[in-house]
A protein has these predicted regions:
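Short, surface-exposed patches at the edges or C-terminal ends of soluble domains, predominantly
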Residues: 2-338
Length: 338
């Protein structure tokens, strides 16, 4: 379960601030969920909940049939699924830590023990890149507080800061049951309910900071025929002033990724850096409307009093849930060293 010679894991202690080092970013991850709310969802509910670990094991069988994943060693409820997300970011944390010389610190809005941590100076003081991972289900009502918005706004006045917002998918946002079923048959993930809506907190940040984006759908990315390899991204490298796409051709596979729909034509306000081709094998309202790729990476340069950058990328790009290719690792390194 743990890698040999890995540092001892610590739990249930206060964060020790990292010292500023010129040219080396201090990266923080902020999971927007209430861990208890998500884990206490009724497992008989059809929509807007995570799978239990038992459900994951059944669907993915026999991938998780080793000793590491049994009842004696791993949580079998929804909590096990959330812990898999935590574990899946460790490769990114390791790579970014090596690249920057600073450990990547992970925070949760409400953690396993019920401690609530809104975004404030305790998080922001020693953070240069804040990665907001929007994996809160909408019914959990994790809205950003006015004082959080004010704290982030003040932080973004600091030179060299970057707010990375990662809203996840919005599947089945209609009352039309036939459309929900069409979406399901498109992404083909039996662990995703017919309605699964995420990222109220991230949406609140996007509204507060005038980010002209809406996270929509859960789209299956296209692969190269006869392989499991993703089709290359469509990139706009002339707009990539931060070098985020240097040596990057693909991100990673995830069966239901959000489309970051733009609500403005102002190219000076926000730049679309990369699009991902969509799997066209099964119909979807998005492709039926004439679209064959979705927006995957966007950037807002500093503007007015905001000295920091804003980047939008799905949170699952920073996990190894479906593997971590050489191209993806290069993207992680670019994010760490931007």
């Amino acid at each position: 379960m743990s890698k040999p010679n890995r540092a001892a894991r610590a739990y249930n202690q206060d964060h020790v601030p990292r010292k500023y080092t010129p040219g080396r970013r201090r990266i923080s991850i902020y999971w927007t969920w209430s861990y208890p709310w998500e884990c206490n969802c009724d497992v008989a509910a059809m929509d807007n909940r995570f799978s239990t670990w038992t459900e994951v094991r059944r669907v993915a069988w026999p991938a998780f049939e080793g000793r590491d994943w049994d009842q004696a060693n791993f949580l079998q409820g929804i909590d096990g699924t959330l812990e898999l997300f935590h574990r899946s970011t460790i490769p990114f944390q390791d790579l970014a830590g090596e690249a920057t010389g600073h450990p990547v610190v992970v925070f949760q809005r409400v953690d396993q023990a019920g401690y609530r941590l809104p975004i404030d100076e305790r998080i922001l003081a020693d953070t240069d890149t804040l990665m907001v991972f929007g994996l809160d289900h909408l019914p959990s009502a994790q809205d950003a507080l006015p004082e959080e918005i004010a704290a982030i706004r003040e932080w973004l006045k600091r030179e060299g800061t970057c707010l990375l917002i990662g809203p996840h998918h919005d599947v089945g946002f209609t009352d039309d049951l036939k459309q929900r079923q069409m979406e399901y048959l498109h992404h083909r993930d039996p662990l995703v309910p017919r309605q699964q809506r995420f990222s109220l907190y991230a949406r609140a940040l996007m509204k507060a900071f005038d980010v002209p984006v809406v996270n929509k759908w859960g789209l299956r990315p296209a692969v190269i025929k006869g392989t499991k390899d993703l089709q290359p991204l469509t990139t706009f490298r002339d707009l990539d002033k931060l070098g985020l796409l240097k040596d990057v051709t693909t991100f990673n596979f995830h069966p239901h990724l959000p489309h970051y729909e733009l609500t403005t034509d102002d190219a000076k306000k926000i730049s679309l850096l990369a699009c991902q081709p969509v799997d066209l094998e099964a119909p979807h309202p998005f492709t039926q409307a004439g679209n064959n790729e979705f927006n995957a990476l966007l950037w807002m340069p500093p503007r007015a009093q905001r000295a920091g950058d804003i980047v939008l990328a799905d949170l699952t790009i920073f996990t190894e849930l479906f593997g971590a290719s050489e191209s993806l690792c290069k993207f992680w390194r670019n994010i760490a060293k931007m």
